[in-house]
Amino acid sequence: MSFYTVVATFLSVVLASAVFWVLAPKENQTVWRSTIILSMSMMFLMWAVTYLSQLHPLVVPRRSDLRPEFAE
């Protein structure tokens, strides 16, 4: 669980996009390419933002189930 996971996923999305660029169906090829590649890139961006925000939260979570004398 680190930044390398994001890099590895990015490289796999780039590889899948390159494969689909070559193997796209011949009729409406431009539509297929742009639809699939844009969909994969936007899903990667949403996943990466969510994953990285969970790794490095802006607000530190607090436990609410502690007794007051043990709470900080």
UniProtKB/Swiss-Prot annotation:
Entry keyword set: Hydrogen ion transport, Ion transport, Membrane, Transmembrane, Transmembrane helix, Transport, Vacuole
GO cellular component term of the entry, any: vacuolar proton-transporting V-type ATPase, V0 domain
Transmembrane segments: 3-23, 35-55
Topological relation to the membrane, as annotated: Multi-pass membrane protein
Recorded GO MF terms: proton-transporting ATPase activity, rotational mechanism
Location of the protein in the cell: Vacuole membrane
Domain of life assignment: Eukaryota
GO biological process per UniProt: transmembrane transport; vacuolar acidification
InterPro entries for this protein: ATPase_V0-cplx_e1/e2_su (IPR008389)
Major place of residence: membrane
Positions in the Lumenal compartment: 1-2, 56-72
Presence of the UniProt keyword Ion transport in the record: yes
Keyword Metal-binding (UniProt): no
Topological domain ranges for the Cytoplasmic compartment: 24-34
PANTHER family, A to Z: V-TYPE PROTON ATPASE SUBUNIT, VACUOLAR ATP SYNTHASE SUBUNIT H
The family this protein is said to belong to: Belongs to the V-ATPase e1/e2 subunit family.
Oligomer and partners: V-ATPase is a heteromultimeric enzyme composed of a peripheral catalytic V1 complex (components A to H) attached to an integral membrane V0 proton pore complex (components: a, c, c', c'', d, e, f and VOA1).
Described function: Subunit of the V0 complex of vacuolar(H+)-ATPase (V-ATPase), a multisubunit enzyme composed of a peripheral complex (V1) that hydrolyzes ATP and a membrane integral complex (V0) that translocates protons. V-ATPase is responsible for acidifying and maintaining the pH of intracellular compartments.
Name recorded for this polypeptide: V-type proton ATPase subunit e
Species per Swiss-Prot/TrEMBL record: Eremothecium gossypii (strain ATCC 10895 / CBS 109.51 / FGSC 9923 / NRRL Y-1056)
